[in-house]
């Protein structure tokens, strides 16, 4: 049976064209727009709301990213975690993934190439508090390792709370030790629990990776590959503090102090150098103020840029889809990488025993071929110094050259040699159409090749392998190493003319004026000639090109013209040319436009016409006379006519000037209307997009302002940019830093702004951390991490009292913010900080949370207005109606005079005022009140006393200690007493005592008998007068006889029996009630169970009946009731 063919739609032909025309629509969704209208208004509203929420979540405050695009600094990736979580193993695995290099020990930062434009610096964060604070300030990405088998530890939570006030960089969680879980269900539950706990601390959806067991000392390659991909594509938002300050992570340190000085004084201040990649903003080249956390503040002695030890792959400007193995570089000078290990006092270099192998399948380049040939050498270089120069393989070595004295006057070189060693490379690139001045600037200035007087040698076309290597950049340019048809190559044609053209064009290139001006080896004439290009011009005129192809290295004659004659000719030609330029009307019009009377439009036209003469740069080429002679003739011919036009233009009448002013007003009005109207294309642009475009435009302007400057001049003006590998020299560093240097602890060099070098009172908004076990007390020392510094100071806490004063607090509030004022270095307001009581690891052995408080800076000042309450009490000793005399409040009349007019009040609330002092010794004073007070009243005066902040500030210098984790500053008073075994002193006035108040005796109220008789009965005195004599019954005692005593005894016994029976009856009744309640509870429980069963049975039957009814109705039959 034949198979059926599939249907293939036609794509060409008449029928296909008709179908294409049918598909053409008028822009609507379909031919029937009503069919595709909104079906549900609620759904559309929800969709619109969701779209708006997504767009709003993407918005953030636009910030200027000052990181350069061409060579950004390496991304600092900090690996942090508690001890034993696998930090070193993770770094080894990642380094192995990026560079194929195995590290035995991690000491210091390690930089690797991660992509075409990205480099990564891995840093292992130690577990001490000082290192965690320093790493939190410079890390771009934090890999937070968590032991999944144990959970979150105290170091992890502390580090998260340190990151928050310092900018909160990117964080990625990594769970390790997953292989310790025996059951899959337990592992799944642990992952879910830790993931949600991690999201609680950061944000919903924070990335969390899972690493299983270790294989061969590394994590599995697939898991490391997934993690490295996320690291490579991670985007970073500029942080505020880092975007305003320069900083670097030192990857190398050297001591440059003279050994003689150290021998004379071992404690002398050291001169050190720190190396590293610059981050943040530009670092000034001279006298930059920096701070090294853990050491102190310094001023740099010298800052210089070095060659990048780990350059990015895109530096060669060659587009590649992936990195080659040679481009996967690694740089870690303080680790055993690359065979070089920097120790404290020596450098270890590992020399590998394997030689360079030339048995490679790939085609070798020029450098590799040279190394191969050096391996085959039988004798080292310099053994046979008289071997001479062998030009050809079948010729003899030439020892000397006989030169005719009549032809050459060998007087030595009188001018500086031109760097012409790259003529061949320039000619090849020019022939290929890829000539660039940057290639010339990158030439090696130490090349000893000199072609002065030997241009004829370049024109030789002899087939030689050595010459072929000299003129070729690579094997691709040669077209094969053993090619016998070199004479047919295009690049060999007209080499002499190309060389002469290259020499003539060398004078047109921009020269480094500063280098020529400050070169002491040049005389003023030579410097002027070098600036004007006279040396290149003279060398071009002195060279006699020989086109004789039969001669090889033919020595040509040198024209002996003096420099002074050339200088005079140049000056004459320059003066003639300048005089002609002053006659040019266009240049004169441009000059006039620089003044107020000049027209802006005329200046723009003049710039467009004259800009063609300045294509070579800011400096005029005065030697290209041939190219400019024709133009100058034309300018001189038209100068007379232009002069007449200018004279006529100067005689403008008043009417023409008014018309010109009216035209300018109209242009200005139209411009304002256009601005009010706005650009119709930008009507939909919101504020966020507009601000980002404004920032981008400003960055382009800033970048273009320095593009035309050489690197040295640019560094003098704006400093060294981020991404530059710099060398910083610092003097007078404490000798402990060098003696106790440990590369495991990070060394950060942070730049300081001018305002941050001053000290004063800093007011902050502070809150005790909710996990810290104790509240903070005023005048207890606290260690602050603010800016680059870590310092200890004494804060005073306060709170705003009715927005009129700052009232001092003895302790911080429990769950709210308060103000804190302390003496320390200034930082910009709104900068975050965190505070701890101690950075020593011994303080953490108690298992408590060490982050004491967090907050932000509010204000910086040199004074403060914190006050505390002062209550003065006194008692009256004389009272005259509303006037009273008070004592025991002041001790002298001077104090009374200071408080005259102050408000006072009594405990009962009667207000008064201080008047005058009445005693010259004891401080008594007269006061008036709004009502009469009693002698028993206490009078008090409420005042506010200013509090002075203690000016104490000391830097945390843990890097100067032998043990970096045990730095101790000022201790608390309780700690000192505990260590010394002293008891807390108890002041008598501060002790709590029982309040003993004397009982008051009131005199009896005497109401006159006449008044008492008029009172109603209820208002009369009820208290009777006590009897002075006892009554009749009180005087006599009742004695019982025997019969009465028997009756009373019997009644007492009967009552006792009755009481006992009543107690037994009540107890029996209570027991019966208890049994009854138990029985009723059982019956109630049984009733509830029975009701539950009945309900379940009823619902089951009812559901069955409903299902039956549904089935019967679905089958189309009517159910019977």
UniProtKB/Swiss-Prot annotation:
Q: What is its EC number?
A: 3.6.5.-
Does the UniProt entry include the keyword Transmembrane helix? no
Cite the residue spans of the region called G2: 109-113
Q: Cite the residue spans of the region called G3.
A: 124-127
Region annotation G4: where it falls in the sequence: 176-179
**Region of interest called G1, as start-end residue ranges on this chain:** 81-88
Q: Where are the transmembrane segments?
A: none
The EC category is: hydrolase
Q: Which residues carry this modification: Phosphoserine?
A: 438, 442, 464, 474, 476, 546
Q: How does it assemble?
A: Interacts directly with rcl1 and the U3 snoRNA to form a stable subcomplex. Component of the 90S small subunit processome also known as 90S pre-ribosome that consists of the 35S pre-rRNA, early-associating ribosomal proteins most of which are part of the small ribosomal subunit, the U3 snoRNA and associated proteins.
Mind telling me what this protein is named? Ribosome biogenesis protein bms1
Q: What is the lineage of its organism?
A: Eukaryota, Fungi, Dikarya, Ascomycota, Taphrinomycotina
